[in-house]
Design a protein with these regions (language model features):
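Short, charged, solvent-exposed linker or helix-capping segments at domain edges/interfaces
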Residues: 165-167
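Two-component histidine phosphotransfer core
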Residues: 1-128, 133-143
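A short coil/beta-turn micro-motif at the C-terminal edge
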Residues: 99, 148-150, 160
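C-terminal beta-strand of the catalytic ATP-binding
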Residues: 155-162
Length: 167
């Protein structure tokens, strides 16, 4: 059982990590290891669990040794959390990374109302801009599957071969 002090310490740590990530996003460009991006995602999810106690979060990071453009995956996770907690007390978000023969994949799943992220994505972050950045820097494709009242599955596929990664 966590003590109140441990819980507060974790919240302070998560908040500082997330703030650092946001400040770095102003001037950082290029690629980072997914492991680094995932550390900011974990910090964000930790903060959200504190704000939304009913939020269930699962991170399955089977593979993290590939690169992504800085600050492109975390905004997608933010959108999934917003969708999950918007209409449900018991929202759920799953973030997975795994490897296929031809690509690395990052999957973000929410149990929100199933509205397409393309239609709903926050005004401050342009979904199409993220798509373009992922495509131009690592050749990634984004697949979105959504079902009304069931949620959304967003998969980012980063090819292993046939694309030159621009750093």
């Amino acid at each position: 059982m966590k003590t109140h002090d441990q819980s507060n310490s974790r919240l302070i740590y998560d908040t500082s990590m997330f703030m650092q990530h946001n400040m770095d996003a102003v001037y950082k460009q290029g690629l980072v290891s997914f492991d680094i991006e995932l550390s900011y995602i974990r910090a964000y999810l930790g903060m959200q669990k504190r704000i939304h106690p009913g939020l269930e979060v699962l991170v399955e990071d089977k593979v993290t040794e590939f690169k992504v453009p800085y600050n492109t995956i975390e905004p997608l996770v933010e959108n999934a959390v917003e969708a999950a907690v918007e209409t449900k007390q018991d929202g759920k978000v799953v973030v997975r990374s795994y490897e296929r023969l031809d690509c690395f994949a990052i999957q973000i799943v929410d149990n929100g109302n199933g509205v397409s992220p393309v239609k709903k994505f926050r005004a401050k972050q342009d979904f199409r801009g993220l798509q373009k950045q992922l495509k131009s820097s690592v050749g990634a494709l984004i697949e979105v599957r959504t079902k009304p009242d069931k949620g959304t599955i967003l998969t980012v596929k980063i090819p292993k071969q046939g694309y030159v990664i621009k750093e």
